[in-house]
């Protein structure tokens, strides 16, 4: 596991974008594993800028997202499909037919989960996966528990996660209570992983990642078992976890 300490969020986004650029430059039909939330927004802005400057080409790129809320369709402004369209896909030369997000409106959610894993495998797996981390150490919607599920699955959201995500909704009552989430097993198959950490509320989880044991009660610690993980934190976080 490689730790990079950067000055601030701007530099974090810049460094992450350069890593993505390297992958795309080496493999023009790469499969990118993408995440939502506020943390990767800076990265996406940098990628859009690179695309406009002809530094990277998305015409043959494919993407897979980590998760989606159950009950929200892609036209819903709070859905992760909508987020990805607004924050990235609408601004680069990507074929949206090559962008994959779990279907939160699927009639058979378990079947949707199985098909999603099948699709990732058909694409040849993920070349680079961007991750964020929750205050409780969750990765995607893999919440702390006595055991973690390897495959894409339907999961209930914890009170902590619902409260954290309520900032994106008008009220906490509007936050979905379930999601389709890629499992840790599928995430760990990615050839390269980049974990971006933003916000002091993540300090305890990051302390556990670097100073604690590997445990399902801090899902992020599972990343220690991957051969190519880069964790990017800012100086403020570095001081907080000393």
UniProtKB/Swiss-Prot annotation:
PANTHER family: GLUCOSAMINE-6-PHOSPHATE ISOMERASE. NCBIfam families: nagB. Pathway: Amino-sugar metabolism; N-acetylneuraminate degradation; D-fructose 6-phosphate from N-acetylneuraminate: step 5/5. The active site is at residues 67, 136, 138, 143. GO terms for molecular function: glucosamine-6-phosphate deaminase activity; identical protein binding. GO terms for cellular component: cytoplasm. This is Glucosamine-6-phosphate deaminase. The keyword ATP-binding does not apply.
């Amino acid at each position: 596991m490689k730790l990079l300490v950067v000055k601030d969020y701007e530099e974090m986004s810049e460094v992450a974008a350069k890593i993505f650029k390297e992958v795309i430059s080496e493999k023009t039909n790469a499969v990118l594993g993408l995440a939502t939330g506020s943390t990767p927004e800076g990265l996406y802005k940098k990628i859009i800028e690179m695309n406009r400057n002809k530094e990277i080409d998305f015409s043959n790129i494919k993407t897979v997202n980590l998760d989606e809320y159950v009950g929200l369709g892609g036209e819903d402004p709070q859905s992760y499909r909508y987020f990805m369209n607004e924050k990235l896909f609408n601004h680069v030369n990507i074929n949206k037919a090559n962008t994959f997000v779990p279907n939160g409106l699927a009639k058979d959610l378990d079947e949707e989960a199985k098909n999603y894993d099948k699709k990732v495998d058909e694409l040849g797996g993920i070349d680079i996966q961007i991750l964020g981390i929750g205050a409780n150490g969750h990765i995607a919607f893999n919440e702390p528990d006595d055991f973690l599920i390897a495959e894409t699955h339907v999961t209930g959201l914890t009170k902590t996660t619902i409260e954290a995500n309520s900032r994106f909704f008008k009220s906490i009552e509007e936050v979905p209570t379930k999601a389709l989430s890629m499992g840790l097993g599928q995430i760990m198959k990615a050839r390269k992983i980049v974990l971006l950490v933003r916000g002091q509320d993540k300090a305890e989880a990051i302390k556990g990642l670097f100073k604690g044991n590997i445990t399902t009660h801090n899902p992020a610690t599972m990343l220690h078992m991957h051969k190519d993980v880069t964790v990017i934190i800012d100086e403020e976080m570095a001081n907080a976890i000393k």
